[in-house]
From Swiss-Prot:
Name the UniProt record assigns to this protein: Alpha-sarcoglycan
Gene name of this polypeptide: SGCA
Topological relation to the membrane, as annotated: Single-pass type I membrane protein
GO cellular component: cytoplasm; cytoskeleton; sarcoglycan complex; sarcolemma
Transmembrane segments: 291-311
Stretches of the chain found on the membrane's Extracellular side: 25-290
Modification type Phosphoserine: residues: S377
Record localization: Cell membrane, Sarcolemma; Cytoplasm, Cytoskeleton
Subunit structure: Cross-link to form 2 major subcomplexes: one consisting of SGCB, SGCD and SGCG and the other consisting of SGCB and SGCD. The association between SGCB and SGCG is particularly strong while SGCA is loosely associated with the other sarcoglycans. Interacts with the syntrophin SNTA1.
Cystine crosslinks: none
Length: 387
């Protein structure tokens, strides 16, 4: 019995593991609050590929979610251009997300249908060093979000931006696709791109060039369809085509004024020359008003009822007055009609002939006698023979 159990145990474990099923790998990452976090999902780190197989030729897709939840946390996004391109997890954590989060990623090989899992342990913490109070957001229309997430394009953007900003350390704070900000999907013609928002922070103040771009005069020129004011050389061109009408500057070094909470008072208004409080109302007796409101309609209704009763009971013409006002010829004609009617009724009542019984077929209308049928109707067939 023990030998049979030892024989079936490895087989059962293999069935539960499934084809291609392996234990999920675990990787620890350290995102920083307020800084962009980018993690590349490569097929080689998930699937056990043969040595001669090139990772770029194997279609692989990914599915990522927060452990114990069906989707990713709010600050984290996933994107992949196609199964032949790597996937990216990117975003910027907020102070509320500080702590430990576990992201479970499953890779699917679209050729062999193999799957592999990986757990990403994110230990989110605060960044070290001085804060970055000066923040600028650019809209780059010449790139998609997948083209800016790798380290090389991001470093090239910071290097090119250093020519427009005063010397200082620049940090990427966030990268967002223009589609996530309400942008439209471009047409697949002319190499059009979706666009990407890149947010950069620095401890150095804004340069004069950036302040001029974000000035009200530049916004007015953009509203008229004209290019904004740019007093310096565009070092981002031609590799990065920036929409200078969509540049926003945020200075967090100046604290925002806190809204004062209104203090509840005692409900008594202070002395105000324009406010005239109402005088005290004297007590009034509403008994007379109530009596007038109720008794006057009742008296009017009573008078109308008495007038109607007098007209109906005391002002009737009477039968005698009606007969006197009627002519004699009309009265004779009327009486004749009544007398003739009574005479006809008496004659009809004195007839000895019984009332006709129309349902009986043997009844004689002229004599009124009842005769038995000559033929026994019970012996007559319903349908006569046809000769």
């Amino acid at each position: 019995m023990a030998a049979a159990a030892l024989l079936w145990l490895p087989l059962l474990v293999g069935c539960l593991a499934g084809p291609g099923g392996t234990e999920a790998q675990q990787t620890t990452l350290y995102p920083l609050v307020g800084r962009v976090f980018v993690h590349t999902l490569e097929p080689a780190s998930f699937l056990h590929l043969p040595e001669h197989a090139a990772p770029a030729t194997i279609p692989v897709t990914y599915h990522a979610h927060l452990q114990g939840h069906p989707d990713l946390p709010r600050w984290l996004r996933y994107t992949q251009r196609s199964p032949h391109h790597p996937g990216f997890l990117y975003g910027a954590a907020t102070p509320e997300d500080r702590g430990r989060q576990v992201i479970e990623v499953t890779a699917y090989n679209r050729d062999s249908f193999d799957t592999a899992g990986q757990s990403l342990v994110l230990l989110i913490r605060d960044p070290e060093g001085s804060p970055l109070p000066y923040q600028t957001e650019f809209l780059v229309r010449s790139h998609d979000v997948e083209e800016v997430l790798p380290p090389t394009p991001a470093s090239h953007f910071l290097t090119a931006l250093a020519g427009l900003w005063e010397p200082g350390e620049l940090k990427l704070l966030n990268i967002t696709s223009a589609l996530d900000r309400g942008g439209r999907v471009p047409l697949p013609i002319g190499g059009q791109k979706e666009g990407v928002y890149i947010k950069v922070g620095s401890a150095s103040p804004f340069s004069t060039c950036l302040k001029m771009v974000a000035s009200p005069d530049s916004h007015a020129r953009c509203a008229r369809g004209q290019p904004p004011l740019l007093s310096c050389y565009d070092t981002l061109a031609p590799h990065f085509r920036v929409d200078w009408c969509n540049v926003s500057l945020v200075d967090t070094s100046v604290p925002e004024p806190v809204d004062e909470v209104p203090t509840p008072g005692d409900g008594i208004l202070e002395h105000d020359p324009f406010f005239c409080p109402p005088t005290e109302a004297t007590a009034r007796d509403f008994l007379a008003d109530a009596l007038v409101t109720l008794l006057v309609p009742l008296l009017v209704a009573l008078l109308l009822a008495l007038l109607l009763a007098y007209i109906m009971c005391c002002r009737r013409e009477g039968r005698l007055k009606r007969d006197l006002a009627t002519s004699d010829i009309q009265m004779v004609h009327h009486c004749t009609i009544h007398e003739n009617t009574e005479e006809l009724r008496q004659m009809a009542a004195s007839r000895e002939v019984p009332r006709p019984l129309f349902p009986l077929p043997m009844f004689n209308v002229r004599t009124g006698e009842r005769m038995p049928p000559r033929v026994d109707s019970a012996q007559v067939p319903l349908i006569l023979d046809q000769h």
